Design a protein with these regions (language model features):
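Short, Lys/Arg-enriched N-terminal segments with co-localized hydrophobic residues
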Residues: 3-13
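C-terminal binding/interaction regions
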Residues: 17-19, 23-24, 102-163
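Helix-adjacent hinge/juxtasegments
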Residues: 58-98
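Glycine-rich phosphate/diphosphate-binding loop of Rossmann-like nucleotide-binding domains
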Residues: 18-38, 42
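A short beta-strand-loop structural module common to alpha/beta enzyme folds
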Residues: 41-52
Length: 163
């Protein structure tokens, strides 16, 4: 997994993949310096302007890297977050969570060990989005009974995604 020696998040280096479509561009640009301030190195995989693009083309970039273990976590942003959620959750080992509030942010990590955070750029305001990201990054997976539930999801993945 890539590491950067110049950044530190909670005492360890972390890179996080970041991508959006045109509906999430403004929020993505707002989150990049915020992530750096938290000590996280954002790996920006586009889009790079507000021209209309297809969200699957950008969701796949992050989901593939997280699925393969090349990135530990990712953040995807589109207008509502729904499209990016649909794309990301097509990949094995991806637990993408569409989050619009702080409670869901915490629970997506604590209970579901979400590895991709999805935000609706036209739904969530910039300041709330920053709080959501901070809570999401700072919340560890609780394990315990939640681990057993994730193991059931992993078993379903293995059974249903054999091809």
């Amino acid at each position: 997994m890539p590491r950067s020696s110049s950044k530190s998040f909670q005492g360890r280096s972390m890179q996080i993949g970041l991508a959006c479509d045109h509906g999430g561009f403004e929020l993505k640009e707002e989150l990049k310096p915020f992530l750096k301030m938290l000590g996280v190195e954002p790996i920006d995989m586009g889009t790079f302007n507000e021209d209309s693009v297809d969200y699957p083309d950008f969701g796949v970039l992050i989901a593939e890297k997280v699925s393969r273990g090349e990135l530990e976590k990712g953040i995807l942003i589109c207008g509502t977050g729904i499209g990016m959620s649909m794309v990301a959750n097509k990949f094995p080992r991806i637990r993408a969570a569409l989050v619009n509030d702080l409670y869901s942010s915490r629970c997506s990590r604590e209970h579901n060990d979400a590895n991709i955070l999805i935000i609706g750029g036209r739904i969530v305001g910039k300041e709330l989005a920053k709080e959501i990201v901070k809570v999401w990054l700072e919340t560890p997976f609780a394990g315990g009974r939640h681990k057993k539930r994730l193991e059931k999801i992993e078993a379903l993945e293995k059974e249903k995604f054999k091809g």
